[in-house]
Amino acid sequence: MTTSHMNGHVTEESDSEVKNVDLASPEEHQKHREMAVDCPGDLGTRMMPIRRSAQLERIRQQQEDMRRRREEEGKKQELDLNSSMRLKKLAQIPPKTGIDNPMFDTEEGIVLESPHYAVKILEIEDLFSSLKHIQHTLIDSQSQEDISLLLQLVQNKGFQNAFKIHNAITVHMNKASPPFPLISNAQDLAQEVQTVLKPVHHKEGQELTALLNTPHIQALLLAHDKVAEQEMQLEPITDERVYESIGQYGGETVKIVRIEKARDIPLGATVRNEMDSVIISRIVKGGAAEKSGLLHEGDEVLEINGIEIRGKDVNEVFDLLADMHGTLTFVLIPSQQIKPPPAKETVIHVKAHFDYDPSDDPYVPCRELGLSFQKGDILHVISQEDPNWWQAYREGDEDNQPLAGLVPGKSFQQQREAMKQTIEEDKEPEKSGKLWCAKKNKKKRKKVLYNANKNDDYDNEEILTYEEMSLYHQPANRKRPIILIGPQNCGQNELRQRLMNKEKDRFASAVPHTTRSRRDQEVAGRDYHFVSRQAFEADIAAGKFIEHGEFEKNLYGTSIDSVRQVINSGKICLLSLRTQSLKTLRNSDLKPYIIFIAPPSQERLRALLAKEGKNPKPEELREIIEKTREMEQNNGHYFDTAIVNSDLDKAYQELLRLINKLDTEPQWVPSTWLR
C-alpha cells in the first residue's frame, strides 16, 4: 500500500509561546511525503515524483564529484601498493600445489564444514580442570589469588547456569540453515510421472502410480509446494553476501537487521526520500517492524535482501516490498538522533466529537494509514509519541485492523479548528438569522493565535475534539437516570409516560420544585416541593437546579437532589429535558444516560402526527427537521445513543432494550466521572 505524506506541521517553540498551524498550500506539502510500505488492503495510491530544484541538483552533482574523487584516490593508492618492492618479491614465490586424494569422496556422507561453524563447545568441567592446571603452574601469590577468585566464580551456581545458556545459544547459532527447496511444483512433477508410467505394465511402475494417487502423498506434495512457494519467493541472503555488500559503505556505521514477517502481518513502517536517501519516517503499532523493535525512525535504508535502496524513489521501494515476506534482511545506517528509550505507553480511550476522513485531510502524514471515524466513535489510542498524530484503533475493529491508524492529536486538531474559525470569521459577513440560529451580539475580542495551554475555556466551549472515556457498570442498587432529549412532537414525552405507566415499580420521575401555592389534593414531597421564591432563587444561584423556568409568575424546576432521591430509592429516574440542561446534568455526579429521540423523514413524521389527530403545516415539519439537525450539531457530544422514532411501538421496545443493557453490559462514560 502506498501512502503519501503532506507534512503540514505544527511548530512548538516553547510551552509559553503561541503554537502555529502551517496551513500551506497542497503544492507545498507535496515536497514532504511519506510512504507506508507493505500495509494491508488495496489502498495504494502512487505518489507523483518530486521535481528537484536546481539547488538540489547542484548538491547531488557535488556529491557525485566527491565520490569520483574518492574512487580515483583509492585507485592511486592501490597502484602505489602494487608497485612496492615487498609485493614484487612475494609475487615471485611459486604458488603451492595441492594433492589430489582419490580416496576422498564427499558423496559418501562426509560433509565439509565451514570454519565459520567449526566452534568447539567447552564444558564447565573442562574450564574447571584448565583453571586447576593453571593454578599448579603459576606460583606467585598474585596469580594464585586471581585463580582462586576464578575458581570461586566457576563454582557459583548462577555462573554455571549462564554458562549453560551460552553453550545452548552457541549450538543453536551454529546449526546449519534449513534446506532450500529445489522446486515448488512437486504436484505437477508427480502428474508428469504418472503420464509417463501409463503405457508401462511393469509391476514397479504400477505400484508407483498407485502410491502417487494416495490421498496422503497428494496432501504431502500439496503442503510441500505451498511451503516451497513461500520460501522460493525470497532468495536466501547468506552472511557472506551481506558482509560483502557492507564493504561498499566503508567509513559509515552500518547495522544489519533481520525481521521475520508473515504474509498476513504488514511491516508497518513509512519511508520518505531525503535527496538520494530512503529514510524510515514512522514505525506503526501492530506491524512486524514495531514488534521486532529493530527498525527506528530516522534509520537510512541501504539494502533490503541484497537489493540496493539508496537512490530509489519511495514508489520503487513500495513496489519492491509489496509481496515480500519471510526473512527480510535490512542494511541500515542508524539514526544519529539519540532518543530516550520509549516509556511504556498507557492506552487511553477517547470518544470522538467530530467526523474525520483522512482522504480529505491534506495534512495527514500517511493518508492511507489515516483512520476514519465518525462523531461518537470510541477510539483506543495506543501511542501519543507524535503529539500531532496519534496512533489508534477504532472500537470493534481491533481484530480486523492489524495496523494502528493515524488520527489527529487533540492539540493539533484544536489549533487548526481555531485557525479555521478565525479565517471564516474574517471572510464571512454576518448572516441573517435562520430558523435554527438566533442572532448573537458578537463581542469584540483581540484576535490571537490559539494556545492550548492558555485557552481551556475556549477548548471546552467552542472546539470539541476528544473526551477521555472509561468503562462503567452501574451498581444494581444505584441506577443511572435516563434522559430523553428531542424536538417537540418526536415522541419523547409519550415514550417516557409509557415506561412510567407500564413499570411503576421500576421507573419514577423526579419531584419538581415550585414557588406557587399548594392546591387541594396535592401532597408536598409527592407532587411538588413547595418553596419560597427567595429559597428557589438562592438554589438557582447555587447551581442546584438541572433546569428551571417561569410560568404565570411562578417558578418551576427540577433539582439535582430530587433526581438523587429517586436514585437512592433504587428506581430508575426518567426525565425529559431541554438541551440547555445537559451541561449542568453532565457536570453533576448523577452519571446520566442520555438518549436522543430523533424524528423520521418528513413524510413519515407527517403520517405519525396524523395518527394523533395533528395536521402540521409543511413549514412546521421543516422546522422540526432543522431543529433536530441543530440539536445534533450543538449537543450531539452529550448523547450516548439515538433512536429514530419511525414507529412508537418499535421505538418503545428499542428504548427498553437500551435501558436493560445498562444492567448487563458496561458502558463508556467520561473518565472524570470515575475520579
Curated annotation (Swiss-Prot):
Which positions make up the signal peptide?
A: none
Q: Which residues form the Guanylate kinase-like domain?
A: 479-660
The segments labelled Disordered in the record are 1-34, 51-78
Q: Which residues form the L27 domain?
A: 120-177, 179-235
Q: Where does it reside?
A: Golgi apparatus; Cell membrane; Endomembrane system; Cell junction, Tight junction
Give start and end of each SH3 domain.
345-417
- Organism superkingdom: Eukaryota
* Keywords for this protein: ATP-binding, Cell junction, Cell membrane, Cell projection, Golgi apparatus, Membrane, Nucleotide-binding, Phosphoprotein, Repeat, SH3 domain, Tight junction
- The residues that hold ATP are G486, P487, Q488, N489, C490, G491, Q492, N493
Q: How does it sit in the membrane?
A: Peripheral membrane protein
Record's keyword annotation contains Electron transport: no
Q: Which segments carry the region annotation Interaction with LIN7C?
A: 181-243
Described by its record, this protein's role is as follows:
Plays a role in tight junction biogenesis and in the establishment of cell polarity in epithelial cells. Also involved in adherens junction biogenesis by ensuring correct localization of the exocyst complex protein EXOC4/SEC8 which allows trafficking of adherens junction structural component CDH1 to the cell surface. Plays a role through its interaction with CDH5 in vascular lumen formation and endothelial membrane polarity. Required during embryonic and postnatal retinal development.
Into which family does the record put it?
Answer: Belongs to the MAGUK family.
Q: Partners and quaternary state?
A: Heterodimer with MPP1. Forms a heterotrimeric complex composed of PALS1, LIN7B and PATJ; the N-terminal L27 domain of PALS1 interacts with the L27 domain of PATJ and the C-terminal L27 domain of PALS1 interacts with the L27 domain of LIN7B. Component of a complex composed of PALS1, CRB1 and MPP4. Component of a complex whose core is composed of ARHGAP17, AMOT, PALS1, PATJ and PARD3/PAR3. Component of a complex composed of PALS1, CRB1 and EPB41L5. Within the complex, interacts (via HOOK domain) with EPB41L5 (via FERM domain), and interacts with CRB1 (via intracellular domain).
The free-text domain note is: The L27 domain 1 functions in targeting to the tight junctions by binding to and stabilizing PATJ. The PDZ domain binds to the C-terminus of SC6A1.
Protein name, UniProt field: Protein PALS1
The upper taxonomy is: Eukaryota, Metazoa, Chordata, Craniata, Vertebrata
- Gene encoding the protein: PALS1
